[in-house]
């Protein structure tokens, strides 16, 4: 019977698949065909091995925009590009895998953090169908950006189970981000490829150009996404330099240096300020041991920002971005590029409240706040347009309940992360927790003036970091309950140890 089934079912299917593959070698498949193939290609392994899906989602979203642009060599710009759905299909598979784990009672947890994440995800989904002022399809399109990757929290919280696995994912992501940094420098020094130029000619993406000059975007969807990636890459480099290991410092310094040129030339000044704040937060603030010192530092920072904002005697900014990008792409000397990008470009930061872009954002924020008075539960997914702030976009679309939920998630993540840093005996794990808390802190700053949880890599790293912190905290609590204190009175250490060294794809750093 098995032989009959093999001869009359399996062999014909293999022949048919071979014929289809041969046909497609000579005929370029459509976007929809390509999308379906790659979704199935990545989805099936993800359902069987959810951890593999985690690696996919630290890679695919970074390079799919580059792959999409290659199609412009053979076809016109489509009204709807199905290739955008490839990584979303993998995320959907990961959600199904998590649901199956819960159904089988293997990874179920009554953790409050997980409940908050689930409630936030469900609220985002409900606002697609209920209380929305747009159609379901348009609402689903908004949910794709706002809500789908929220569940990546559970990748860090439940799918990965050991500290060593988490560090391997970090190593994989650092290599992926380094590749995008190098490609960004290629665009700066040698310009854009033919397919990228065709893509640029077909779009009206206003923020991609400044005075008609295109900013580098590497493999990402936009210069802002490139800046997010380089900001995270720099922080990973700083973490590796602080970590123990004979080879980590050099590799950390390499990727930190590689992140700087694309970050500067992309000219997203919010990322510059957020990175500086993140460096101080990681290297100084999270290493202070006394609470009153931390409160004093925070108070001084708030006072400084208030004085900075109220200062009115500063000169206005001249437009220098055009010269900056031309200097980068025409290969001018380093001093000229530094003068343009660092000295002149930062002149606008002296009095940002008088900048046109800031005034426009303030007008948008006022409109959302006024609208929220009449729609306290939000107007539904994809109804606010670009709000220039993730927090106000949440307020405008899912209302005050959604904003309170998100702020609760953010506060709990930062609080639990600091508890892990303070109470962990494992210095390597404490250092890793500092990195995760810093990533959350930096992206939270960026979300004040942008929506950095709508596109990779910001959304992927943010929710994954929260998930890892949740897992570390749960294990710390379980260990403390099992062994409340050692001989010295200190809480029990986490069961996850970091004695094996940081492992990267293809090589282990002891």
Predicted regions and their residues:
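Alpha-helical transmembrane segments of multi-pass inner-membrane proteins
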Residues: 121-129, 167-199, 204-212, 218-288, ...
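Aromatic-anchored transmembrane helix interface
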Residues: 84-94, 115-125, 135-158, 177
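TM-adjacent membrane-interface loops and short helices in multi-pass inner/ER membrane proteins
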Residues: 322-387, 391-394, 398-405
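Interfacial loop-to-transmembrane-helix boundary motif in multi-pass membrane proteins
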Residues: 51-54, 107-122, 147, 155-192
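Loop-to-helix entry and N-terminal half of a specific, functionally important transmembrane alpha helix
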Residues: 254-258, 417-449, 461
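Transmembrane alpha-helices of multi-pass inner-membrane enzymes
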Residues: 18-20, 235, 276-279, 291-297, ...
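Hydrophobic alpha-helical segments of polytopic membrane proteins
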Residues: 1-17, 36-44, 168-175, 234-318, ...
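N-terminal signal-anchor transmembrane segment
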Residues: 5-102, 126-130, 443, 464
